[in-house]
Amino acid sequence: MFIRPPVLVLIGLSAAILFIAGCKKEQRSGVPYTQVDIQFNVNNPAYVDLQVPSGWIYITGGSRGIIVYRKTMDEFVAMDRHCPYRPEDGCQVFVDDTQVTVRDTICCGSAFLIVDGSVTGQPAATGLQQYNTTFNGTTLRIYN
């Protein structure tokens, strides 16, 4: 079978466009991409709530702020507070009185687990945007 040169050009251009489109920064769940690279010493008195497992704090950063949760002595989770349900509304989630659930009852009406940001109450279909974390025993780094 003989393929005409213009068809080969179209195939090549299509492949190039798909490759380039695949290289742009990802916006998970429609939450705006915000560069995050934060480091702090968890032993600082300002972060006393992070010194034991199940502790959490709010910090500035990300799209609508960040929740930092200590799962174990060596493992942390950092999640954006921007609700992924109708992200254009800019709803911000809060840790509720149970200390287990993150929710926004006024704006997005969704609920998430504090341990991993997964959805526990609709209408959100995707969990909270998570950031990478590394911990060396004293300094926690949160980044994307």
Language-model-detected regions and their locations in the chain:
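Charge-rich, low-complexity amphipathic helices
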Residues: 1, 23, 72-73, 105
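Short cysteine clusters
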Residues: 83, 104-107
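Sec-dependent bacterial lipoprotein signal peptides
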Residues: 1-23
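Short, flexible active-site loop motifs that bind/organize anionic cofactors or intermediates
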Residues: 13, 37-40, 107
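N-terminal pre-ligand scaffold of iron-sulfur
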Residues: 25-99, 112-116, 127-144
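Acidic, glycine-rich flexible loop segments
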Residues: 120-121
